From Swiss-Prot:
Matching InterPro entries: Caspase-like_dom_sf (IPR029030), Caspase_cys_AS (IPR033139), Pept_C14 (IPR002398), Pept_C14_caspase (IPR011600), Pept_C14_p10 (IPR002138), Pept_C14_p20 (IPR001309), Pept_C14A (IPR015917)
Catalytic center residues: 93, 136
Entry superkingdom: Eukaryota
Record-linked SUPFAM superfamilies: Caspase-like
Location in or out of the cell: Cytoplasm; Nucleus
Stated name of the protein: Caspase-14
Membership in a protein family: Belongs to the peptidase C14A family.
Species assigned in the record: Mus musculus
Positions of the pro-segment in this chain: 156-167
GO biological process, one term: proteolysis
Length: 257
């Protein structure tokens, strides 16, 4: 006997309150990174259009990456009015999990992400924190694969494992790492690309979409991924493909406009 099942119910849309201050910090290594100034100009236009209080710092050393994030955290916690959202843009040469400072030394991305989490930044508890990372994450190059006919990429996910968890509703507390969005210029293990005169395709596409399109930020990142997946980068005379990677622990819809 088949059990009766009710019709699926649409999700209730819950949005982050964006009526408070919006703060942004951009840390960019321009040394040996031609085209990065063009990216910074595009980001400044975007933040101005989206009504962010924006701070931009050039050529931080590895240690200064951490120091600037610490100072940004203190600025947020001491802001006179409620803060709704924070953006952090990190642009540098990189490897898997690492960024290279102006002094050629490395800083761990995880150490940078720790600074604004729900434990360390009280003013941003339960508030969206968006990281945009324009950097290589390895040495692999993606030549791309051809789609056949109406073939689309997709797959099924399974939830499994040996752990047993007891769940109970406790809205009075939240995990340390919620309300965070990481937008990487490329997938883990792969190179990121930048044009000497036009800047990076990632930053230029992102700023264009964030200014000219409306939707939740996750919908906007889907559009950025679609646009970048449809373009080709020439490197050493060979066509390459690149697409962003998005990691989200957002609990609500984030709308910038």
């Amino acid at each position: 006997m088949e059990s009766e099942m009710s019709d699926p119910q649409p999700l209730q849309e819950e949005r982050y309150d964006m009526s408070g201050a919006r703060l942004a910090l951009t840390l960019c290594v321009t040394k040996a990174r031609e085209g990065s100034e063009v990216d910074m100009e595009a980001l400044e236009r975007m933040f101005r259009y989206l009504k962010f209080e924006s701070t931009m710092k050039r050529d931080p050393t590895a240690q200064q990456f951490l120091e600037e994030l610490d100072e940004f955290q203190q600025t947020i916690d001491n802001w006179e009015e409620p803060v709704s959202c924070a953006f952090v843009v990190l642009m540098a040469h990189g490897e898997e999990g690492l960024l290279k400072g102006e002094d050629e030394k490395m800083v761990r991305l995880e150490d940078l992400f720790e600074v604004l989490n729900n434990k360390n930044c009280k003013a941003l508890r339960g508030k969206p924190k968006v990281y945009i990372i324009q950097a290589c994450r390895g040495e692999h190059r993606d030549p791309g694969e051809e789609l056949r006919g109406n073939e689309e990429l997709g797959g099924d996910e399974e939830l499994g494992g040996d752990e047993v968890a007891v769940l109970k509703n406790n809205p009075q507390s939240i995990p340390t790492y919620t309300d965070t969005l990481h937008i990487y210029s490329t997938v883990e293990g792969y190179l990121s690309y930048r044009h000497d005169e036009k800047g990076s395709g990632f930053i230029q596409t992102l700023t264009d979409v964030f200014i000219h399109k409306k939707g939740s930020i996750l919908e906007l990142t889907e559009e950025i991924t679609r646009l970048m997946a449809n373009t080709e980068v020439m490197q050493e005379g060979k066509p390459r493909k690149v697409n962003p990677e998005v990691q989200s622990t957002l609990r609500k819809k984030l709308y910038l406009q």
